[in-house]
Amino acid sequence: MDQFNLKNYPIYANFLNKLAKDLTKFYYKKLDKPFKISNKLKGKGYDPVTTSDKAFEKFIRSKISKKFPNHQIIGEEYGHKNTKSKFSWVIDPIDGTRSYVVGNPSWSNLISLNYNGEPYLGLANFPKMKKYYLNTSKN
């Protein structure tokens, strides 16, 4: 599955649908508790990162790597897993970390599946609100 083909859409859409549900369960079982915060910028401003950001990204990476071991993964907290695949997954484990820190439920997990650098499918998952949105850029 390293070729762009709309026939493969259900494989990726089903994966992301299940991942959204798994991420919400993961949040309530493992992360709905106190967390540690650090500053990614080290004295040149403030860009918070939490232990939850890192845990979410590790969880997402493990799910993607298990299902699509040859795909590239680009994550905000742990960088790039390069492969020769034309598929890449781009992860923002907690979009809205500042909202997460203060308890505002509007934060989300953002995941994009790209092919040759172009978006193919995207997931915006809101675990605290138990909602998610899946969208494609293809017809």
Residue locations for each model-derived region?
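N-terminal subdomain of lithium-sensitive/metallo-dependent phosphomonoesterases centered on the IMPase/IPPase/PAP
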Residues: M1-I94
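A generic structural signal for solvent-exposed, polar alpha-helical segments
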Residues: D32, I74, L113, K138-N139
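DPxDG-like acidic metal-binding loop motif
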Residues: T83-K138
